[in-house]
């Protein structure tokens, strides 16, 4: 299954989760798209609930199914901690996500584009791989030639707050993941136990 590139507003309403991070797409129509959206009250099966939660998390980070599943498999090999939380930490440590958390992009999709286009440096070296795994303390910055890219400057200006687990210097356009986040600091709307149950049946 390839990465979803369709209308994010419709997908957000279908999942009941803001994929843009703004919440605007749910403000007026907090129901699934389609003719019968407002009256759709069908109950999901256990599998349906697990699948829906998996899709919410996958689309939230903008990953294709294969890449998402492979990351879950990597999480199963971490011996300490719980599987669900370890999986979410691996998602959080992706370079495109850290760029988004720092406020250098307004969405994860935009952050992925910035990384792909070579705008982002890690410890002074250009990294154009969105899945690059960031270590706490590494410096994430904007390449000098890209420091006047309007979309980056607009994203920084539009960012009102940042998570407690990152630091950011708006003048230098650089920051870092200062520590790994706690569970209550990321995606409180996600029940990762359902995602684990889904993949435990599939793998």
UniProtKB/Swiss-Prot annotation:
Q: Which residues form a coiled coil?
A: none
Q: Name one GO cellular component term.
A: small ribosomal subunit
Q: Which InterPro entries match?
A: Ribosomal_uS4, Ribosomal_uS4_bac-type, Ribosomal_uS4_CS, Ribosomal_uS4_N, S4_RNA-bd, S4_RNA-bd_sf
Tell me which residues make up the S4 RNA-binding domain: 93-156
* UniProt xrefs under SUPFAM superfamilies: Alpha-L RNA-binding motif
* Any one GO BP annotation for this protein: translation
Q: Name one GO molecular function term.
A: structural constituent of ribosome
What UniProt keywords are attached to this protein's entry? Ribonucleoprotein, Ribosomal protein, RNA-binding, rRNA-binding
Please give the superkingdom of this protein's source: Bacteria
Q: Which Pfam families match?
A: Ribosomal_S4, S4
Protein's UniProt keywords contain Transit peptide = no
- Keyword Ribonucleoprotein listed: yes
Which CDD domains does the annotation name?
Answer: S4
Membership in a protein family: Belongs to the universal ribosomal protein uS4 family.
* Subunit-level organization: Part of the 30S ribosomal subunit. Contacts protein S5. The interaction surface between S4 and S5 is involved in control of translational fidelity.
HAMAP family to which the protein is assigned, alphabetical:
Ribosomal_uS4_B
Q: What does this protein do?
A: One of the primary rRNA binding proteins, it binds directly to 16S rRNA where it nucleates assembly of the body of the 30S subunit.
Q: What name does UniProt use for this protein?
A: Small ribosomal subunit protein uS4
* Source species: Streptococcus uberis (strain ATCC BAA-854 / 0140J)
């Amino acid at each position: 299954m390839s990465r979803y590139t369709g209308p994010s507003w419709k997908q957000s309403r279908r999942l009941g989760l803001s994929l843009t991070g703004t919440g605007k797409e749910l403000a007026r129509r907090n129901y699934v798209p389609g003719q019968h959206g407002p009256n759709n009250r069908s109950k999901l099966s256990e599998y349906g609930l697990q699948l829906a939660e998996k899709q919410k998390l996958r689309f939230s980070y903008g990953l294709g199914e294969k890449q998402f599943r492979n990351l879950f498999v990597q999480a199963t090999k971490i011996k300490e901690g719980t599987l669900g939380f370890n999986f979410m930490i691996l998602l959080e440590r992706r370079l495109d996500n850290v760029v988004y958390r720092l406020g250098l992009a307004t969405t994860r999709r935009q952050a992925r584009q910035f990384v792909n286009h070579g705008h982002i440096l890690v410890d002074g070296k250009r990294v154009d791989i969105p899945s690059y795994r960031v270590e706490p303390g590494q410096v994430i910055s904007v390449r000098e030639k890209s420091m006047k890219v309007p979309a980056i400057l607009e994203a920084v200006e539009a960012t009102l707050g940042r998570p407690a687990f990152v630091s950011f210097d708006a003048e230098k356009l650089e920051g870092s993941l200062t520590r790994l986040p706690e569970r209550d600091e990321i995606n409180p709307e996600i029940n990762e136990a359902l995602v684990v149950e889904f993949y435990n049946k599939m793998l």
